[in-house]
Design a protein with these regions (language model features):
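Conserved catalytic-core motifs of GNAT/GCN5-like acyltransferases
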Residues: 98-100, 116-132
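Conserved N-terminal entry element of GNAT/NAT acetyltransferase domains
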Residues: 1-9
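Conserved GNAT acetyl-CoA-binding A-motif
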Residues: 89-102
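A structural microfeature
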Residues: 49-50, 119
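Short hydrophobic/aromatic beta-strand element in the GNAT-like acyltransferase core
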Residues: 36-40, 51, 65, 130-132
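A conserved beta-strand-loop-helix scaffold within acyl/acetyltransferase catalytic domains
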Residues: 32, 43-45, 52-61, 66-69
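Conserved active-site tyrosine of GNAT-family acetyltransferases
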Residues: 17, 110, 115
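Conserved acetyl-CoA-binding loop-helix of GNAT-fold acetyltransferases
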Residues: 74-87, 112
């Protein structure tokens, strides 16, 4: 046996570790499916102008990405995306929502929508901050 250190995060190594962790986790936690969720604002041709992606998992809506093109910012599109995702999450039985954002992205946006900051990574990756939020739906 030996340790191998690499800076080549190849897909096989990542999948091996992910598979082992997933098997371990499934043997010890209550059953719940990760169900993808996506809300999109599109132009007439189906081109994406804004969107939110994530998943619902048990009691939680986990927001992975929320983006609004610069030309549409400040027009309520992000708020509508978030509201639609939260409404769908409640329909799916979720009680809470989780999101994270960098200090240069949208911390005030989430606070404005009732999210409470629960943790901040300082100096991330060097001089910024990464904020973590939750909200009771």
């Amino acid at each position: 046996m030996n340790f191998r250190i690499t800076d080549d995060g190849n897909e096989r190594d990542i999948n091996d570790i992910h598979g082992m962790l997933k098997e371990y986790n499934l043997s010890r936690r209550e059953a719940s499916a990760n169900v993808p969720i996506g809300v999109f604002f599109e132009d007439e041709t189906g081109g994406k102008l804004a969107g939110l992606t994530g998943e619902t998992f048990g009691n939680w809506l986990c927001i992975k990405f929320l983006f609004v093109s610069e030309a549409l910012r400040g027009k309520g599109i992000g708020s509508e995306l978030l509201k639609a995702a939260e409404t769908e999450a409640v329909r799916r039985g979720c009680k809470y929502a989780f999101a994270d954002t960098f200090s240069f992205q949208a911390p005030e946006f989430y606070k404005k929508h009732g999210y409470e900051e629960v943790f901040t990574l300082e100096e991330y990756p060097y001089t910024g901050k990464r904020h973590y939020y939750t909200k009771e739906l």
